[in-house]
Amino acid sequence: DLDVSADCDWLVERTDAFWREWAARCTYDGRWRPQVIRSLLVLKALTYSPTGGIVAAPTTSLPEDIGGVRNWDYRYCWLRDATFTLEVLLEHGYTSEAEEWRDWLLRAVAGEPEAMQIMYGVQGERRLTEIELPWLEGYEKSTPVRIGNAAVEQFQLDVYGEVMDALYSAARAGISPKAEAWALQRQIVDFVCRHWRDPDEGIWEVRSGREHFVHSKVMAWVAVDRGVSMIENFGRSGPLGSWREARSQIRRDVFDRGYDAALGHFKRSYDDPALDASLLIMPLVGFIPADDPRMIGTIEAIQRDLVIDGFVHRYKVSEAADGLPGGEGSFLMCSFWLVDCLELAGRETEAEKLFVKLADLSNDVGLLAEQYDAKRKRQVGNFPQAFSHVALATSALGLERRGMSPALRRGLFDYP
């Protein structure tokens, strides 16, 4: 007869050995290794092994505001979230996972950039229709409960930059090249060169209409810059001259239309002078130095206006019409971006203090949600969240490698 208990013991031991061996491959050996390994384990666990797809979170409709309506289904593969995950895995020594995701992307997109969605199902599904389930009362009576996500229909310009950044990182890490990968990259850069002037719904997936978000324009610049870098550093073939010119045009446009000299900071969008925490990405992708006066002004303005109870909010919900009622918690990823910017600006002590404060928000098994409600002193939003764990691992590495932005760590020359 089959000894079920013996088989169960063997399965537990085998599972334990697998995860311990995987964690031991982490190349980070700094002060926060336990927290970094926990974050990397979360990212690995969010990966659907049959395809390599990486979900944003394993849950749906956990509220950003208890009792509110900002409840979303995150059980899908956002290209943005997945590319951030890929890059942090590469930086910590996990190349096979990056190669699997690269191959998943090629299968999922499988066409022109015009048809590229911002998100897919774990097996590459394209139809993710958003449906509300009114018979469910929701977590702590937070309704509606949703399955699917209408953001799948949005145009988000920044995604092209994030995909190009990740594919560049994969090439630099020595992942075996594929002809179809470079063909896709060329199509993406050409698409961005044609469409970077178009408004979009942006990284925060607003439901109030398209705008010329500064973050989106910066990431359009990233898309073209990484295409140029692929030609210059890896000998790929492409229209180098026209791409360099497009890169310069985008950068000039951001400085001319995205910066408010009177206010002393970059703006949320070309037509909206409000602040947005997504602006903190600018020095992290190599667009502008963190100690540039324009960026210093932006960092300080965000600290003044968007840091509430010690944590960074994406924007002022009361001022920035995003098409939704109610409020939300502070955004943990943006708070870690502030850590990165402070460190790059030479404010290491302040950066480290904030990092420790953020890391201490994790629960008893080291998990982080998307947001934190400082008034209720609890995590909110879908859980665990890839964004938050990516940002923790990235910031920990940055604090060990003082003065090196993520872009510079990937061998990119900052601020061309």
Model-derived segments and spans:
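Acidic, mature catalytic/reactive cores of soluble proteins
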Residues: 1-416
